[in-house]
Regions:
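Bacterial N-terminal signal peptides
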Residues: 17-28
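Class I SAM-dependent transferase core
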Residues: 33-120, 131-132, 136, 149-151, ...
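General helical secondary-structure elements
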Residues: 6, 10, 41-43, 47, ...
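N-terminal alpha-helical modules
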Residues: 2, 9, 27, 33-37
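Bacterial N-terminal signal peptides that target proteins for export
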Residues: 2-19
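Conserved nucleotide-cofactor-binding alpha/beta core module
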Residues: 112-232
Length: 251
């Protein structure tokens, strides 16, 4: 009898739930966390936040919240999805990787993006970092030099509801001048110098984050702030990133 009595209300609640999903989708809201079935990776994602981020030096509450919200496993394919919350980078195809969760969180924390700021990412990759950044501002642009990765990332971001992120295939060396200047630029590939167009497209007082150094061994994560006198440079920590390719290699 109890089961029969509950059946009607449960069906009604389910109908309301999916109606809300449809409405959220029509508003271009990042609704993947709301509309999907119970997330089998929720516990793994929380462990990642607790053990890899909080246990280190990720202290920004907003960064921790976003890292615990964005479903990293949806940005990976095949067998790598089950390893999404492990403490290391993972392959995404074409010799590229998705950075380990700690590095994504750290770079996001260092860049310190505020609501309404314009952010340019160089190296879309899987689209995960752009998705994370979009929770801080609704003005995110991203450039990926590898055409297939760019197409997959764009499709993935739209499917997951991140339609406000503007992504394109192109050489990140040249930035995205049509939308410049930017408050912040994040480069997610290693280079031995900063591409001049990127500095040109940075607002006065804006900051640029990039792994600088050898493109075959390791680099130093470096923060550059544009000032009236030129730039302020902060060398932060040693990292290992895949190399930036394209025009940058000709200089």
């Amino acid at each position: 009898m109890i089961t029969n009595q509950m059946a009607g209300p449960r069906k009604q609640l389910k109908a309301v739930f999916w109606l809300l999903c449809i409405v959220a989708g029509s508003l271009s809201f990042p609704y993947e966390a709301f509309c999907e079935a119970p997330d089998p990776y929720a516990a793994a994602r929380q462990r990642m936040v607790d053990r890899q981020l909080k246990a280190r030096d990720i202290t920004d509450s907003k960064v921790l919240e976003v890292m615990g919200t964005v479903k990293r496993h949806l940005f990976l394919s095949g067998r790598y999805g089950s390893q999404a919350y492990a403490d290391h980078p993972l392959p995404i195809g074409e010799g590229q990787t998705i950075s380990q969760p700690y590095i994504v969180a750290l770079m996001t924390q260092i860049l310190d993006v505020k609501p309404g700021e314009k952010v340019l990412e160089i190296g879309t990759g899987s689209g995960y970092q752009a998705a994370v950044l979009s929770h801080f501002t609704d003005q995110v642009w991203s450039v990926e030099i590898r055409k297939e990765l760019a197409q997959k990332a764009s499709e993935r971001l739209k499917t997951l509801g991140y339609e406000r992120i503007k992504a394109k295939h192109g050489d990140g060396y040249f930035g995205w001048p049509e939308y410049a200047p930017f408050d912040a630029i994040m480069v997610t590939a290693a280079a031995n110098h900063v591409a001049p167009p990127l500095l040109d497209q940075l607002k006065m007082g804006g900051r640029l984050l990039i792994p600088l150094g050898s493109t075959t061994y390791y680099q130093t994560l470096t923060k550059i702030t544009k000032t009236p006198k030129g730039k302020e440079v902060e060398h932060l920590l040693g990292v290992v990133f895949v190399p930036m390719v394209g025009k940058i290699l000709e200089e």
